């Protein structure tokens, strides 16, 4: 779903024990022989180095830190693929990065299910505004779905080939609702 090829250059800044660090891009890139660069996250270094790469995965906290640097104002991200997830991704962050020219994928996944299970790719601000105009309560998870889903007792249940549970339903404990356009929104998480 992220268009990674053997010619891709992956910039991994998420911790490797984190699904966004290892599973979302790094391991798939390794498997196909793409170039991988792994380093500890630093917002200033990110802005200096990002244009040497084709793909990266950030968390919303990374995105906010990057957007607060002085370098972000003049940063050109044209053609770069940025996947963002691990925590809910708000419209402000999506807009900031898409306005910089990148392809921005809002992503939801879990280690148990697969790192890229539900997502939406934004290539221009018009698409962001269209999705935002159709938003419901919560934050967007996506509308491209790579597993079977059902919402039962308000929580998202998943199964499928990308899940470690295969054909058994797994309760994610995420409180999820779909709008009339089948866009998934996370509205919270059960704590018990």
What are these regions (language model features)?
Residues 1, 110-113, 172:
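Ser/Thr-glycine-rich phosphate-binding loops at phosphate-binding pockets of nucleotides
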Residues 2-9, 17-55, 69:
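Conserved AMP-binding/adenylation subdomain of ANL enzymes
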Residues 9-12, 156-157:
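Short, well-ordered beta-strand segments
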Residues 43, 62-63, 89:
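Alpha-helix capping/helix-boundary segments
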Residues 55-58, 67-134:
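Gly/Ser/Thr-rich phosphate-binding loop
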Residues 135-143:
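Short Gly/Pro-enriched turn/cap motifs at secondary-structure boundaries
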Residues 139, 150, 155-192:
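Conserved ATP-binding/catalytic segment of the ANL
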């Amino acid at each position: 779903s992220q268009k990674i090829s053997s010619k891709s250059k992956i910039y991994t800044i998420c911790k490797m024990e984190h699904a966004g660090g290892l599973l979302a891009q790094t391991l798939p890139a390794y498997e196909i022989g793409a170039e991988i660069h792994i380093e500890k996250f630093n917002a200033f270094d990110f802005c200096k180095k990002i244009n040497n790469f084709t793909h990266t995965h950030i968390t919303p906290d990374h995105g906010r830190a990057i957007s607060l640097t002085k370098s972000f104002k003049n940063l050109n991200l044209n053609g770069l693929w940025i996947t963002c997830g691990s925590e809910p991704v708000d419209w402000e962050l999506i807009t900031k990065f898409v306005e910089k020219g990148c392809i921005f994928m809002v992503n939801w996944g879990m280690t148990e299910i697969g790192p890229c299970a539900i997502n939406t790719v934004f290539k221009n601000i018009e698409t962001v505004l269209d999705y935002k105009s159709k938003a419901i309560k919560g934050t967007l998870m996506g509308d491209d779905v790579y597993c079977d889903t059902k919402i039962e007792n308000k929580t998202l249940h998943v199964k499928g080939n990308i899940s470690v549970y295969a054909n058994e339903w797994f309760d994610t404990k995420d409180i999820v609702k779909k709008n009339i356009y089948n866009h998934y929104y996370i509205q919270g998480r059960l704590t018990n």
